[in-house]
Curated annotation (Swiss-Prot):
Alphabetized PROSITE patterns for the sequence: PLANT_LTP
Pfam name, any one: Tryp_alpha_amyl
Keyword annotations of the record: Allergen, Disulfide bond, Lipid-binding, Signal, Transport
Family classification: Belongs to the plant LTP family.
UniProt protein name: Non-specific lipid-transfer protein
Molecular function terms, GO-annotated: lipid binding
Signal sequence coordinates: 1-26
Gene3D superfamilies with a match to the protein in the record: Plant lipid-transfer and hydrophobic proteins (1.10.110.10)
One Gene Ontology term from the biological process aspect of the record: lipid transport
Amino acid sequence: MACSAMTKLALVVALCMVVSVPIAQALTCGQVSSNLAPCIAYVRGGGAVPPACCNGIRNINNLAKTTADRQTACNCLKQLSASVPGVNANNAAALPGKCGVNVPYKISPSTNCATVK
């Protein structure tokens, strides 16, 4: 009887541990676009990069924890650059460096996001 009670207790403890583990949320294009909205003026016209833009790039980079997240971010950036009129590809590609953020892919319409690790 004592063995059965200990087994049940162990199962309850294990179940609580599994249930309490936070589930990672996947990065979305909505998060990418809202974080990078302050960058639109810069990628269109150059000049000084707004601090809010750099904060957005840092935030996206920090949110992209997995390969799937980084590939999602890459694809979202490609979609955004195609949908926002007047984007200067050189300005977009220069953003991470100007903000001191190491992004593991080039921000470019020609980037193959499937190869992003």
